[in-house]
């Protein structure tokens, strides 16, 4: 079996008219500006953000290319503090309050403007 040792890249696609809203959402969620962005045309624009040891890219897509929503899990040291910060931030849609699962993971969820769910969690194991 091959071991994967590189960084993880998450690519989220949106139509051009939603691009700036999605880019701004991830800028607020991650608390950083993109480390790389471009805007060559309606089908060639994007923004890349660092997320732990990986990247999250928000990319434009052609109208005829549809992708479904995804779930992204991002670990944070303090779920409750992150929840308070994002509740106070503009443009963040909270879809669930912090809860602790029976197996010890605490999380809450937000939804980006394109319908993707982001679980912000902390696990003790």
Spell out what each predicted region is.
Residues 12-14, 38, 98, 122:
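A cross-domain feature marking catalytic cores of carbohydrate-active enzymes
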Residues 25-28, 85:
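Alpha-helical scaffold elements within enzyme catalytic domains, especially in hydrolases
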